[in-house]
Amino acid sequence: MQRRIMGIETEFGVTCTFHGHRRLSPDEVARYLFRRVVSWGRSSNVFLRNGARLYLDVGSHPEYATAECDSLHQLVTHDRAGERVLEELLIDAEQRLAEEGIGGDIYLFKNNTDSAGNSYGCHENFLVVRAGEFSRISDVLLPFLVTRQLICGAGKVLQTPKAATFCLSQRAEHIWEGVSSATTRSRPIINTRDEPHADAEKYRRLHVIVGDSNMSETTTMLKVGTAALVLEMIEAGVAFRDFALDNPIRAIREVSHDLTGRRPVRLAGGRQASALDIQREYYARAVEHLRNRDRDPQIDQVVDLWGRALDAVEAQDFAKVDTEIDWVIKRKLFQRYQDRYDMELSDPKIAQLDLAYHDIKRGRGVFDLLQRKGLAKRITEDEAVDAAVDTPPQTTRAKLRGDFITAAQEAGRDFTVDWVHLKLNDQAQRTVLCKDPFRSVDERVDRLIASM
């Protein structure tokens, strides 16, 4: 499948600093954030005009699920638009707090852990054909996903009893299973719960929950693009070396703690391989596969960065990727800060800087400041991101959903939507079932909109 439906779900961390004596719980802060949403959507679980889903998840974490996208740049643009949507809610909530005499600054963090050790996720979704052998997908993907943090981790300072140490991944310490149908209880690498949000006879939805939330657009592109490419190769029958891991959960932590990528991890049967070895194998297969594939400039970008990132890790010389890979950008920032102020990695100010890196508010968040200075590369344009706040992808089912929502809201009609259903809640209870996520034109939806 060269054209694939993809999406990203991101849970955001929330905190608030108060200017006066009154304090609010995280639940109350979250309710302030979503008050504007509830006022028009009558719920804290809504679909937006751009086709995305916005809701309040378990533990007072706002969650944004992008609409269905069929290209990497489109997906990164809509992922970034999600940050803008949440930023608007943040600004609105701060104004409400001020009007009610509760002065405070609200912070939304696109990260994966809080100071109490809780974890929240960034989930990638990929449409795969039902006819394929799902167990083979899991078997081949698992070693890839365990070692992918070498090129896609968001970076984290981990406080251990001995000392503070810089790790590749925020999520690695919180994964407890390889493949499972649960998402919160056991936190697997791949979630197997079968909810395709499409024609179940044709498709499955692969739900990857191991990845970090990335601030870097190029890292997001690399994270999703490499996974999509490996999926494409599996579907095409490409043969891979057997890197079945003896213990994926131990391996994912070992990889996260080794910035050189050279520490051997134990494979099934007593063999060993390093994260660099494993990633090199998948990269080599990808380069070979692309020789016989139609050219795609976006995939070319992914493979180019993949190769350069592996070269940088191998040489331990990150100059050629230090504006493109999240954990490298963050580590360089910390090193400059430590050198300037003569401080240890365990200093609380580094922990504050780590958090501020993930602050999504423009003009305040550290990553945004780095981006403005040209220290973090972009692949999106502001105009495209602004448009994506209100406009769905034009090449997928998301267009049908977004157009329907816009028309119903403008006509003042009561409606219900989910990923596959569009329904007018009038006497006729008219519903259109959209089972093909690739389809952006549908006469039934046109008629439903015209009937308003």
UniProtKB/Swiss-Prot annotation:
Binding site for ATP: 53, 66, 419
Pathway per the UniProt entry: Protein degradation; proteasomal Pup-dependent pathway; Protein modification; protein pupylation
Residues involved in Mg(2+) binding: 9, 55, 63
BP terms from Gene Ontology: modification-dependent protein catabolic process; proteasomal protein catabolic process; protein pupylation
Keyword Calcium: no
NCBIfam families: pupylate_PafA (TIGR03686)
Other notes: The reaction mechanism probably proceeds via the activation of Pup by phosphorylation of its C-terminal glutamate, which is then subject to nucleophilic attack by the substrate lysine, resulting in an isopeptide bond and the release of phosphate as a good leaving group.
Protein name: Pup--protein ligase
Species of the source: Nocardia farcinica (strain IFM 10152)
Classification of source organism: Bacteria, Bacillati, Actinomycetota, Actinomycetes, Mycobacteriales
Gene: pafA
